[in-house]
Curated annotation (Swiss-Prot):
Belongs to the LpxC family. The gene is lpxC. The keyword Lipid biosynthesis applies. PANTHER family: UDP-3-O-ACYL-N-ACETYLGLUCOSAMINE DEACETYLASE 1, MITOCHONDRIAL-RELATED. One of its GO terms (biological process) is lipid A biosynthetic process. The active site is at H266. GO terms for cellular component: membrane. This is UDP-3-O-acyl-N-acetylglucosamine deacetylase. HAMAP family: LpxC (MF_00388).
Length: 298
């Protein structure tokens, strides 16, 4: 068994919200064992807390949001920071922000991984719990689908399917065997992406107001617009895996199981997690994973 983790020190950063376009300061605090992941909006009076669990997930249109039904407010775009926390196996943290949205940074989880490592990781004197799959659960939406199945480890198998010259048979699929080390080297730096035609339509509707070439991969009808190009030939599908890592962390624990997704996104990932939780025999919270050395994963 391994121990729960939190931060050693307080750290902060400032950035722009992808959808709101607002500047926001993010401050991360250590937390006691069994606190869980708590987001706190201090721009509101009184400050409002959002505890990470599946029932707290609100809108999943274009991003994953957490809601507080008591106050009727949300915190937007938590998935990249959540992926970074999951990637480093952090169980307990308080995240203060002075605005409605987690900053987009460079469009990946890498700046958040660096921020968390700058704070330092501290072990607590309590066993780490995991969300372990015991049965296969699958959800579908037209030709899109997502599935979780039992596995003594954590793997993600993802396929995208865009009718675009940048996407081809060689870079539309990726299989990822999750460890903290492999997450940092293979997944965390993959950036969010969009298409020029869609971006202007979304801006007209009040979304992606903070989007830019420094915070996402942008493609016109033929190619990547960013002068630096892609970080990986298959950066797009790697980012979809990053999103899935963050979305699955909405259960509040690191997951032990195998995820398979075909054209899945935030909404279907959330639907899958809710379908799993609705089947009580399909999962368990446990600190002991027989047949799996979790110390090699985290």
């Amino acid at each position: 068994m391994i121990k729960q983790r939190t931060l050693k020190n307080i750290v902060c950063t400032t950035g722009i919200g992808l959808h709101t376009g607002q500047e926001v300061t993010l401050t991360l605090y250590p937390a006691l064992a069994n606190t869980g992941i708590i987001y706190r909006r201090i721009d509101l009076n009184p400050p409002v807390d959002f505890c990470v669990n599946i029932e707290s997930v609100g809108s999943t249109f274009l991003c994953t949001c957490l809601k507080n039904n008591t106050y009727g407010v949300q915190v937007l775009t938590v998935e990249h920071l959540s992926a970074a926390q999951s990637g480093l196996g952090i169980d307990n943290i308080i995240i203060e922000l002075n605005g409605p949205e987690v900053p987009i940074m460079d469009g990946s989880a890498d700046p958040f991984v660096s921020l968390l490592l700058k704070a330092g990781i501290k072990e607590l004197n309590s066993s780490k719990n995991f969300f372990r799959l015991k049965q296969i659960v699958r959800v579908e939406d037209g030709d899109r689908w997502a599935e979780l199945r039992p596995f003594n480890g954590f793997t993600l198998d993802f396929t995208i399917d865009y009718d675009h010259p940048v996407v081809n048979m060689k870079n539309k699929h990726y299989f990822f065997n999750f460890t903290s080390k492999s997450f940092r080297s293979e997944i965390s730096s993959a950036r969010t992406f969009g298409f020029v035609d869609n971006i202007q339509k979304l801006k007209n509707c009040g979304f992606v107001l903070g989007g830019s070439l420094t915070s996402s991969v942008v493609m016109d009808k033929y190619q990547v617009v960013n002068s630096e190009g892609l970080r990986f030939n298959n950066e797009l599908v790697r980012h979809k895996i990053l999103d899935a890592v963050g979305d699955l962390f909405m259960c509040g624990y690191n997951l032990i199981g195998s995820f398979i997704g075909f054209k899945s996104g935030h909404t279907l990932n959330n639907k899958l997690l809710r379908a799993v939780l609705a089947r009580r025999k399909a999962w368990e919270i446990t600190s002991c994973i027989q047949g799996c050395d979790v110390s090699k994963i985290f």
